[in-house]
Amino acid sequence: MIQMQSQLEVADNSGAKRVQCIKVLGGSKRRTAGVGDVIVVSIKEAQPRGKVKKGDVHRAVIVRTAKDVRRADGSVIRFDSNAAVLVNKNEEPIGTRIFGPVVRELRGRGYMKIISLAPEVL
């Protein structure tokens, strides 16, 4: 679960390394976000000459969480860290590559571009 002030790794080559959640989208009282949800993030650490720079505000889709993701068949999947992919207003990825595995639940949310760029879908 991701909430305001949560720090996440960036799993793409947009130039950002670390981001902080500043808003969970999807309702005025919504406090937490899980895999496949869109959040608003501030870039806290970035690579030089990247597409984004420190201090920028962007939207991001959560692709990995340390909190369990429960599947319909009863299985559970979790990761060591929280990670997100930066997206634009149309929810298309800013980067051209995705690093690390992503969860299958993104397919049901309509993020086929992220699924196709990912090296592994769990």
UniProtKB/Swiss-Prot annotation:
One of its GO terms (cellular component) is cytosolic large ribosomal subunit. GO terms for molecular function: large ribosomal subunit rRNA binding; structural constituent of ribosome. Keywords: Ribonucleoprotein, Ribosomal protein, RNA-binding, rRNA-binding. It comes from the Bacteria. This is Large ribosomal subunit protein uL14. InterPro entries: Ribosomal_uL14, Ribosomal_uL14_bac-type, Ribosomal_uL14_CS, Ribosomal_uL14_sf. Binds to 23S rRNA. Forms part of two intersubunit bridges in the 70S ribosome. The lineage of its organism: Bacteria, Pseudomonadati, Pseudomonadota, Alphaproteobacteria, Sphingomonadales. Part of the 50S ribosomal subunit. Forms a cluster with proteins L3 and L19. In the 70S ribosome, L14 and L19 interact and together make contacts with the 16S rRNA in bridges B5 and B8. It comes from Sphingopyxis alaskensis (strain DSM 13593 / LMG 18877 / RB2256). GO terms for biological process: translation. The keyword rRNA-binding applies. Disulfide bonds: none annotated. Belongs to the universal ribosomal protein uL14 family.
